[in-house]
């Protein structure tokens, strides 16, 4: 949880917030995507997190990728902006959010995937055809669905 969100939660508890987030989906040359098994809800997801005060969206996405997966993004391409009712989510700890998420696609990065900060239990590349949407973290299912639908053009 980001510093800004942590401080906000101290004041408002679990009350619903609009959470602005930035994320990166890493895709290798075989069009496999890197996902991590989240330690909070035990679902698969890509790297991402809340934007800090005065932080640029791209900088947040890159920071989250490095913190969660140990990778340094070299090139980013805007993929999608995820928002709406499907992003409304209650975390296992009771925090309620309505996400506005800016997602980038990254095909060039530096480093080897590693579980850096403990937010992920496992990291793994998935062929898009083998992904079971029921095992994807609920607020990002629309993004993964779109990724699967557009795989041939990426």
Question: Which residue ranges define each predicted feature?
Answer:
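Active-site-adjacent beta-strand/loop module that shapes the phosphate/pyrophosphate-binding cleft
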Residues: 82-112
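Conserved hydrophobic "DFG−1" position in protein kinase catalytic cores
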Residues: 26-27, 35, 106, 125
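A short coil-to-beta-strand element that immediately follows conserved catalytic motifs
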Residues: 72-82
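Conserved Nudix-box catalytic region and its N-terminal flanking loop in Nudix hydrolases
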Residues: 28-68
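NUDIX/MutT-family hydrolases
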Residues: 103-107, 114-144
């Amino acid at each position: 949880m980001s510093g800004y969100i942590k401080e906000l939660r101290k004041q408002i508890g679990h009350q619903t917030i609009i959470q602005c987030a930035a994320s990166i989906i890493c895709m290798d040359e075989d069009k496999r995507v890197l996902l991590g098994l989240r330690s909070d809800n035990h679902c698969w997801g890509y790297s991402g997190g809340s934007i800090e005060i005065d932080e640029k969206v791209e900088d947040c996405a890159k920071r989250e990728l490095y913190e969660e997966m140990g990778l340094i993004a070299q090139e980013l391409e805007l993929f999608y902006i995820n928002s709406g009712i499907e992003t409304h989510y209650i975390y296992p700890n009771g925090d309620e959010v309505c996400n506005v998420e800016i997602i980038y696609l990254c095909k060039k990065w530096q480093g080897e995937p590693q579980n850096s900060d403990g937010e992920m239990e496992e990291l793994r590349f998935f062929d898009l055809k083998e992904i079971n949407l029921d095992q994807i973290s609920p607020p990002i299912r629309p993004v993964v669905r779109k990724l699967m639908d557009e795989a041939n053009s990426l």
